[in-house]
Structure formats: C-alpha cells, structure tokens
Amino acid sequence: MDGSGKTTQLALLAKWLSASGHRVFVTEWNSSALVKAATRMGKKKNALTPMTFSLLHATDFADRLLYKIVPPLKAGMIVLADRYAYTAFARDVARGVDRQWVRDLYSFAVQPDLALYFRVPIEVSIERLLARRVKLKFYEAGMDMGWSTNPVESFRLFQGKVIEEYERLVDEYGLHVVNASRSITEQQHDVRHLVAAHLGETHDARTGTDE
C-alpha cells in the first residue's frame, strides 16, 4: 500500500542480506523500459482507464519477469521485488476490473517464496505521503475513478478498497503481515526474522536498521 514504507524496508533488507554474504537483486514495479514511457505519458494526460492501466502493468511485469526476475533466480541470487502481482490483484480490482480476470492475466507469474504485506492505516499513509510532497498524485489517489474531487477523500475511498483486496489476499495467498505503523527499526526486525527463518538462518534480535 502507498505510504506503508515498504520501499525503505526492502532497501534495508537488501543491505542486510548483502552484508550477510548473499547476492541480491532488487526489482521495482513499473520499471520496465519497454512500457515505462507509455505509462508515464498516459498518467501525464490522465488517459489511463482501469483496463489500460491493468494491461500496462501486466506488460511491465511480464517483461521484468523474463529479464529481471527469472535470470537472477537461476543464477542463485535472492530477488527482492518492490511490489509483485499482488499489487495488481488489489489495485486493479479496486478500480473495478474483474477479480478472476486479473488473476488469470498474471497466471504466468512465478510464485514467490515469501510475500510480505505492510499493513498501515489509511490516515498514517496519507500523513507519510504528504510529509514528502505537497499533494497526492492523481492515480495514487484514485482520482481517475471520479469518486471525489478532493484528492485526500478520493485517496481514502480508493485505498479503502485496495486494503479490502489485500486483506483478502492474506488468506488466499498466504501473505505475511507486517505492522507498518511501527518504527522502521521494529518493522525491519520482523522482516529480517521472517526472511532468516525462510533461509534457515538465525537472526539476532538486536539487529538494527543501520547494519
């Protein structure tokens, strides 16, 4: 969810894993050179419909899966994805796209070994986002849906629907919930504990964010 702090947590996790001797590769949502320019242009003109948005993100994901996710995995690296197919499952459905259609669209996706959901209240998310910039972005706030002309209120309505879908995914796909309302250090402790357990390694509870 926007404003949950997941990007910060992923960066800290990558640093920790690398320091522990692991080879790490990080990939971000909507970062494929193949479609990034088209997505940026569509956003600039406010021309993206829910279906178009969904298809563009699926194309981005397919391109990155082929060139940025599978190759590092085959090379024995740990791949950290800042957002995964679950992002589409939540956002696209919140925009009214058929739930099963979206899942079928991403049927080619590799099942991740570990998926984290950074759960954060909407008001905390808004506070964090507005602390970094003057206003909420058009699509980030769900303004394309026409639910409200007020960006903050639109964000509440849109992200409320997104949260409903993420909560559904927790049980459906076994997402691990991280309480993103807590401090960066506390969150990172939990994240490292989950990852270390999956890797079959021990984790020092005293580990901080600066290691």
PLM features per residue range, with description:
Residues 14, 127-211:
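NTP-dependent small-molecule kinase module
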Residues 82-83, 108-132:
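Conserved phosphate-donor/acceptor-positioning beta-strand/loop module used by diverse small-molecule
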Residues 31-33, 85-86, 120-126, 183-184:
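Conserved nucleotide-binding/hydrolysis micro-motifs of P-loop NTPases
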Residues 3:
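Walker A (P-loop) phosphate-binding loop of P-loop NTPases
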Residues 16, 20-110:
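ATP-dependent small-molecule kinase phosphotransfer cores
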Residues 25, 114, 176-178:
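Structural signal for short hydrophobic segments within the conserved structured cores
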Residues 6:
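Conserved lysine of the Walker
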Residues 9:
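Hydrophobic positions on the alpha1 helix immediately C-terminal to the Walker A/P-loop
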